[in-house]
Amino acid sequence: DNNPAGSFNVFDFAWNIVLDPSNLNEDEMYMATYGSILRSVDGGESWLEELGGGNAYYNNVEITTDGIVYATLSSEGTGKGIWRSADGMEWTNIIPDGFGNVYGRTAIGINPSNENEVYFLTAETENSGQYTNTFFGGETWTSLWKYTYLCGDGNDSCGNWINLSANIPANRPTTFDNFNAQGGYDLLVKVKPDEPNVVFIGGTNLWRSTDGFTSDSNTVQIGGYVEGSDHGYGNWDIYSKHHPLQHDLLFLPSDNNIILSANDGGVYKSTNCMASPHLWYS
């Protein structure tokens, strides 16, 4: 509140916070902010910058149950990349060859049933990944990669990368049907805890793959806009009892078929995330 007009500090742009469930002796947490990944061991009373530098705008951080940290920093900053750390202090940039040099926000999806597997869905990967035409004459590039940790620091031969970008929904009947993260505004990737091949990605619409996006033939749209929506008054509609622009997806721990979907319209519930067509409750 005391910042001069036109200025800001890193806490004005705090993208997300995660807690370390493996640290039983300290109140350890991580925060993705403008330009930095911060770490605290006293419940947020004080913070240290562990990653960053420059003007990396879109940053993210997630953590496994045993304290392995994954962080992403967009390409505007000197600390750009996809990073892995076993302790939050020593970091390794594991970004794969062929990822591209320009990229924006990245969503991170850790596989709960095998936390060595992590999906990275990245918006605005200029001239790299899947190209899609979007509504109102727009266009975008999006990348989807799956990483598997093998050994050591997880880099080079100690990590395996698979580029799944070609299977992001594109070339659909209308531009409303194509994947569209709108510059990273609406972006998510989640893995079903009890079925590791069931992967959800979200942009304007919400999609479910039953083969981990290893193909484009086992993917269905389960939310967002109605399929076939198009420009013009009366030519578009929203999925029944759901809403476009996806931001998060949560699985009920006691029943992984029950999900909560957060988007621009609010929070929606489904009691069977494998159903097609999908039935939502608002």
Where are the regions a protein language model picked out?
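Extracellular glycan-interacting surfaces
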Residues: 1-282
